[in-house]
Structure formats: C-alpha cells, structure tokens
Amino acid sequence: SVLQPCQPINETISVEKDGCPKCLVFQTSICSGHCITKDPSYKSPLSTVYQRVCTYRDVRYETVRLPDCRPGVDPHVTFPVALSCDCNLCTMDTSDCAIQSLRPDFCMSQRAP
C-alpha cells in the first residue's frame, strides 16, 4: 500500500471535560500521515536521535458547547483545526506524542445524542 503523506484529513473526534456528563463527537480536520524518519544502527550515548512526526503547521481554533454541564462549569471547549501540516518534532504541549493512544473519537463518558 502507498504511504499517505503528512496532510490535513477529516476525522471524527470527541471532546469532554470534568463537570459535563456527556461527550460530544464531531468531524474536524487533523494532521495525519507518514514522515520520513531515520533510526541509526549505531547509537552513541553522545548522539541524540530526533524523530519527526506529522503535526500542525497552521491552525484555526473553534469552540463547541458541551451539553448538560453542572452549574458553574464552563461548557465551552476550544480545539485546533488543521489548515496545514508539517513533519516536525512532536511538541508535547499541543500534540499526543504517545506510541499508542486512544482513538480520537474515544469517550470516557456517555456520548451526547
């Protein structure tokens, strides 16, 4: 099969937060695809290997409102929408850099209808 390049794709994701009993599932644009990486056969303790991952380059932010949140809980959740993507180092502050993670549409709580 042909490896897809790093690019924005449409994906179903979920958002949820403490104090809101329901998870909201919807379509948005995320970065996905393959980046060329190198893994040297000789690893020196003095060398550092950097793996590049498919990550956001340009984004816009959108906000959704979660239903049935408790009084005093802000029902709004803001998330990035991928406009363009790039193969770059993974930034833990903004990206899921785990080797294995949950599906983007996984909900811990009940899904909102």
Swiss-Prot record:
Keywords linked to the UniProt accession: Disulfide bond, Glycoprotein, Hormone, Secreted
Annotated GO CC locations: cytoplasm; extracellular space
Domain of life: Eukaryota
Compartment(s): Secreted
Cytoplasm is among the record's keywords: no
Residues bearing glycans: 10
Disulfide bonds, paired cysteine numbers: 6-54, 20-69, 23-107, 31-85, 35-87, 90-97
GO biological process, one term: G protein-coupled receptor signaling pathway
GO molecular function: hormone activity
SMART domains assigned to the protein according to its UniProt record, in alphabetical order: GHB
One Pfam family recorded for the sequence: Cys_knot
Family stated for the protein in its record: Belongs to the glycoprotein hormones subunit beta family.
Complexes and interactors: Heterodimer of an alpha and a beta chain.
Function: Involved in gametogenesis and steroidogenesis.
Name of the featured protein: Gonadotropin subunit beta
Lineage: Eukaryota, Metazoa, Chordata, Craniata, Vertebrata
